[in-house]
């Protein structure tokens, strides 16, 4: 039996309109049990200032970003289900959903799926890795009832 443990931290000045803890739990449960039976993840919802500071400190990028993934790596002799932390910036997610003409809840789900795959070791540095990761993301999003996250909902193609 699989188990996903969520530690949800809301560090946004305004928590109105955020997805529910149940939403985040459902999104994690659509991803993590596919790869390991027991997982623990912290999701921290932040405002742009905190996202910007973390992105600058850990990635050298002087801007806020949608999601940051911080995988936890225990020493090899210690087995823990802790995968790591996802830091998701509310304002960036909301802005991107508008710009990309996507349903807001679907974009939140995509950020959780995308970030979770990073915690599991997936990346998109080169084209082959990106293609594999996007395929997995799209399958998971479809399983959740959402459209392909890489196609705008208003895209005529």
Curated annotation (Swiss-Prot):
Keyword RNA-binding in annotation: no
Record-level Gene Ontology MF annotations: metalloendopeptidase activity; RNA endonuclease activity; zinc ion binding
Requisite cofactors: Zn(2+)
List of residues binding Zn(2+): 114, 118, 124
Annotated function: Single strand-specific metallo-endoribonuclease involved in late-stage 70S ribosome quality control and in maturation of the 3' terminus of the 16S rRNA.
Protein's name according to its UniProt entry: Endoribonuclease YbeY
Subcellular location: Cytoplasm
Gene source species: Yersinia pestis
Cited Pfam families: YbeY (PF02130)
Transmembrane helix keyword on record: no
Top-level taxonomy: Bacteria, Pseudomonadati, Pseudomonadota, Gammaproteobacteria, Enterobacterales
Origin: domain of life: Bacteria
Cofactor remark: Binds 1 zinc ion.
Family the UniProt entry places it in: Belongs to the endoribonuclease YbeY family.
Record-level GO BP terms: rRNA processing
Sorted UniProt keywords: Cytoplasm, Endonuclease, Hydrolase, Metal-binding, Nuclease, Ribosome biogenesis, rRNA processing, Zinc
Catalytic class of the enzyme: hydrolase
InterPro entries: MetalPrtase_cat_dom_sf_prd, YbeY, YbeY_CS
GO CC annotations on file: cytoplasm
EC number(s) from the headed UniProt entry: 3.1.-.-
Primary site of residence: cytoplasm
């Amino acid at each position: 039996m699989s188990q996903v443990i969520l530690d949800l931290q809301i560090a946004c000045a305004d928590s109105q309109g955020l997805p529910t803890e149940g939403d985040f739990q459902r999104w994690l449960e659509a991803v993590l049990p596919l790869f390991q039976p027991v997982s623990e993840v912290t999701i921290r919802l932040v405002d742009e200032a905190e996202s910007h500071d973390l992105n600058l400190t850990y990635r050298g990028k002087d801007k806020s970003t949608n999601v940051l993934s911080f995988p936890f790596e225990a020493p090899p002799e210690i087995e823990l289900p802790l995968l790591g932390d996802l830091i998701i910036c509310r304002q960036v997610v909301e802005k991107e959903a508008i710009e990309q003409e996507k349903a807001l809840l679907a974009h939140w789900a995509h950020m959780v799926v995308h970030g979770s795959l990073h915690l599991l070791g997936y990346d998109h540095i080169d084209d082959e890795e990106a293609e594999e990761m996007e395929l997995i993301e799209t399958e998971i999003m479809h399983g959740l009832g959402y459209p392909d996250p890489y196609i705008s909902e208003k895209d005529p193609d």
